[in-house]
Regions:
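Solvent-exposed loop/turn segments at secondary-structure junctions
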Residues: 59-62, 89-93, 119-124, 154-157, ...
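Extracytoplasmic/secreted envelope proteins and their assembly/folding machinery
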Residues: 67-74, 97-101, 114, 131, ...
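Conserved strand-to-helix beginnings and helix N-cap segments that scaffold or border functional pockets
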Residues: 64-67, 94-98, 192-195
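Structural microenvironment flanking redox-active thiols in thiol-disulfide oxidoreductases
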Residues: 76-107, 111-139
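Extracytoplasmic thiol/disulfide redox context detector
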Residues: 2-92, 170, 207-214
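Sec/Tat-exported extracytoplasmic proteins
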Residues: 56-59, 70, 74-77, 104-108, ...
Length: 214
């Protein structure tokens, strides 16, 4: 009996490292290291889907470079994922750019204007410091002046700008770009190590949320 017990103990001891390795493999990325847990989860727009929300700023060169990776990645997201963007608003100049984003969305020209606004600020070095400069950019790309002014100054756009600012603050965003997964997790280059890894961590967290919904 003693020999049997000793054999079982030896076998159990030998298997412990394998079990530990299996746990490590299952948790490919670690909270607090590769991503951050949002202390108080933020409600999502559609609880039936996994929300992915990029917090960005048109004046951020890192956000502009991230677009080349983010855009094709976002297009490949499955049907159970709701992809959103939230323009950051930390100071008055950023509010101008956020309102440009929501105005473009309201007018149905966001798909075209999103990259145009980025290019204007990052390559052409336009400050887009006020409404008139935003209006001029839109008019130069085919939007009627009356339409863009009406949208930019609308209650809806102003409300969305305030709500987006509040949402980003609730996420605890530290910089741009950051990706928020289902209002629960925050992914940044600082934690993930690179923009490429941000998307890998995001994929991991999307899968994590999907498995939790089953």
């Amino acid at each position: 009996m003693k020999k049997l017990f000793a054999s079982l103990l030896l076998l159990t001891t030998a298997l412990l490292p394998l079990a530990a390795n299996a746990d490590t493999a299952g948790d490919k990325y670690t909270a607090g290291k590769d991503y951050q847990i949002i202390t108080v989860p933020v409600h999502t727009a559609n609880p039936d889907k996994i929300e992915v929300n990029e917090v960005f700023w048109y004046g951020c060169p890192h956000c502009y470079h991230f677009e080349a990776l983010l855009e094709p990645w976002a297009k490949r997201l499955p049907a159970d994922v709701d992809y959103q963007r939230t323009p950051a608003v930390w100071r008055p100049a950023m509010e101008v750019h956020a309102r440009a984003y929501y105005a473009a969305k309201q007018l149905g020209v966001l798909d075209a204007m999103h990259n145009i606004i980025f290019k204007a600020m990052q390559e052409e070095k336009k400050a887009l410091k006020d409404e008139d400069e935003v209006v001029a950019l839109f008019v130069n790309h085919g939007t009627a002046e009356a339409d863009i002014r009406k949208a930019y100054d609308s209650f809806s756009v102003q409300s969305q700008t305030r709500q987006g600012d509040a949402r980003a603050r609730s996420y605890g965003v530290q910089g741009t770009p950051e990706i928020i997964i289902n209002g629960k997790y925050r992914v940044s280059t600082e934690d993930a190590g690179s923009q490429e890894n941000m998307l890998k961590v995001a994929d991991f967290l999307i899968a994590k949320e999907r498995s939790g919904k089953k």
